[in-house]
Amino acid sequence: MELTTEAPFINNNNNNNNNNNNNNNNNNNNNNNNNNNNNNTPNNTSYSNYPQSGYVYQNYPLNNNNGGNNNNTIYYNQPQQYDPNYQTSVTSNSYPQYSYFASPNIISPIPSPCLGSTPSPIPSPTIYQYSNNSNNYCAINTPPLTSVPSPILNCNNKKRPEFNNNNNNHNHNNNNNNNNNNNNYNYNNSNNNQQQQKQQQQQQQQQQQPQQPQQQSQQQQQQQQQQQQQQQQQFKQTNINTTPKNLSPVLQSVNSSASSTPQIQSYFQQPQYQQQYQQQYQQQYQQYQQPQQLSSANTTPQTNERPNYSSIIQPNQLFSQMVPSFINGAINNNNNNNNNNNNNNNNNNNNNNNNNNNNNNNNNTTTNNNNNNNNNNNYNNITYFQPYTPFSIVDNSSMIVPDKQPQQQQPQQQPQQQQQQQQQQQQQQQQQQQQQQQQQQQQQQQQNYNDDSNKNNNNNNNNNNNNNNNNNNNNNNNNENINSSNNNNMYNICPAAAYQNIQFIKEQSNSSLSSSQPIPPFNLYNEQPQQQPQQPQPTQSQPILSSSSTSVFDINHHHHHQQQQQQQQQQQQQQQQQQQQQQQQQQQQQPQPNLSSSSYADNNNSFQSSSGNVWESQSSPIQSSVQISSPPQSNQSSIAPAPAVNLSASASSVATTTKQSNVKKQKQQQQQQQQQQQTKRQELSDSEDDTDNGDDIDEDDEDDDEDEDDMEDEDTSSSSSSSSSSSSLSKKSPAVKKSGLKKSGRSKSSSNESKAKGHWTKEEDEKLRSLVDLHGTKRWKYIASLLCLRNGRQCRERWSNQLDPSIKRDAWTLEEDRIILDAHSKYGNKWAEISKLLPGRTNCAIKNHWNSTMKRKLSKKQYDFSSLPPISSSIVSDNSSSLSTPTDSISSSPSTSPITLSSNVVVNDFDSQQQQQQQQTYQQPPPQSQDSGNNQFNFNNNNNNNNNNNNNNNNSVESIKLYTNVNISYI
């Protein structure tokens, strides 16, 4: 047999509870019973009425078939008693972080940490389970008086029933304050038929008999109270606090099996179980209903302690205050409680209030939406979360679980109620008059805020009515709007974040409870309990709001709008001040010429000649300044009018400023021209060095330098043209000087040395070799971009000084020393020029050799060139190409004419060489771009990539050849 997924005890309980209430109430409540019976079928579409129980359950974990996953848990726990004077402060690590809720007829037999070893009574065996993953629901029927473990059913594809009717039933039970409440908790299957028969008989008797006077009903209530007190004293003497032997131990999670279900079903059918269960529960409930008072009301226990409570919370007395809107039905319960409480307090309005309850029962979906509308109007900070999910919201460590004192049931006094009604009506009239006066004042002061203030006042008027019918009717008119707006946002919010913004209302304490003392709201996060808001004194800007008729949210809403309005006014004032300051600054900065003066035209021309389109940019501010003198518009009434512009007075100042600016511009132009001339001279001198130095600067680098020069010139011209005052020109003059001091390509590359510093690594050397093999030795800038962290100069120097395979690394010879001495006597320390005479030797190597060895030998005269031959072909070629090559002996076509030296060459004497070099005259020929030239004087400079000869011919030489055609004649 399969277990049913519906709650079997709920439909009949509606009749029992309502009939108990009907004993004291008239036939008006019977209409509610009829409507409730029509709605016994569960409504699967609406899920805002669960849980309908007023029980607040403590956290108590239980493993399940998912291996102890806390998301899928059984909803059973220990209820706690409510005490307005007692507060607990328990750390979050004291108890597990779960929150469970059961159906109205569930209380667990498990001893909770708060009760110690004392269990609570078990009115029903039904346990409900939710699944977080799949939005499903199932019910488990377990007999609590047996040791049979309760099976955990698989909740796949099973929907949960709704308990729409239980909400109203429990409301009636709590609010009537009759002694028959003890019998309302007897949820039994066996006696349902008998109870229904008794109910029908009682209803017939009530219809036949006339209504008894109020005094007789008061006497009956007093008798019932005395009987109840006697029963409680008897049960106190007995040891009922001990756990019964036949109660089940801690429920264990066991997988559903076929063997356990027949035992459960068969046990339910036994009449012994039902009778025994009813008797034990009645005894235990009457004993547990009397709470155990604490020694000191205001004491707070330690972190791991809880008060020893052993009583059951009355349904719906504390649920509306302690757990507002755990789900959507929590606030629905509050609204229904208000109506039912008014029925008990105001006997004259029973019929009207009962009609409202009937509407709520027959239209489950509409009542939920109506209540949601109330929440949106009164609880702006309350949010909703997903249904069918375990509620892990309440933190029991910060839960306030005080002990509620038993309320003595007093007879109803009709005169007192009438007096209260009259007082409330008088207060309402006074409030309405004050509100009307305040509305008139607000309309005069704040035109934009009229709509919001009227809405707030209308809401307050509706809340001040004694009959709650007006509120419900207003909400019924807004069902369609709520369905379209709130349903989408209602179920997609995280549960943990839902209670961070909850604010509890205290006004419902008078309506939900029959006692005169209000109960403080439930605190979730161990915060200080909120004090009851004091009635504000009437002022011109704030209406009077009474605590009995208005809510905290209405007051907060009103203050919130006032704060917003003040902020808007402050922002507008700040904006107006900023606009005034900007206008004043524009008037001070912008020169305004005298249109009538003749000097204005001359100045205008000077502007056009020096700075281009400067005058066009200044024409618009003048027009704007002229327009400022006009009176302000209507929408700018608060802004002070700008002062009028006096063009005739400002003409002289404009003329002086324009002359000064023109003089400064002329001076700057002269300085720029001088700087340009200097830079050209430096470039010419550097270009001579660069041409001699070979590929120190690539063609790509030169093109980039020229482009940058053009860009900088444009920037300087635009900066000078855009500046209209002397201050702006003085600020931008240093930039002009920087642009004028343009350095050569060599200095630019040296400035980029900061891009990468440090020694070269092996990886960089290998990468540089591969890039040079691919791209050659002329595109150093491109190679540097591929290499990263190095610039073109660094790459070129690294290649030419270290990585070039043509570099000689052997010892220096006497021939090389003689060539260096001869070249140094002419060129000095121009090592790049000297390196051209020695293929395979770098300028750095020559410089180091000169500084380290050759200077020392020269000072000591240790050189002896006698061992050398008189002259060798290579040396002669070197000397002839570098030292003794006159321009007259060079022809445009290749020839074999001999080369004559103008003086004798004495090899052994170094002084004679210097004299010879002084007598000779050399003229450096201009560079030639043609490939034609004398191949006689070309050297094998492919290794160093220096193709520039003394004639600056770009002829590539592939192999070394002896110059057999060169005839040297000695004079």
Curated annotation (Swiss-Prot):
Protein name, as recorded: Myb-like protein AA
Biased composition (Low complexity): 11-40, 163-220, 332-381, 528-551, 563-590, 617-661, 668-679, 717-730, 911-955
Pfam families according to UniProt: Myb_DNA-bind_6
GO biological process: mitotic cell cycle; positive regulation of transcription by RNA polymerase II
CDD domains with a match to the protein in the record: SANT
Entry GO CC: nucleus
Subcellular location: Nucleus
Biased composition regions of type Polar residues, renumbered to the chain: 41-52, 294-309, 591-616
Biased composition range(s): Basic and acidic residues: 754-764
InterPro entries, alphabetized: Homeodomain-like_sf, Mediator/Homeobox_domain, Myb_dom, SANT/Myb
Compositional bias of kind Acidic residues: 685-716
Chain positions covered by the region annotation Disordered: 1-54, 151-220, 288-309, 329-383, 440-487, 509-764, 874-898, 911-958
GO MF term (any one): RNA polymerase II cis-regulatory region sequence-specific DNA binding
Residue span, HTH myb-type domain: 752-803, 804-858
Gene (name only): mybAA
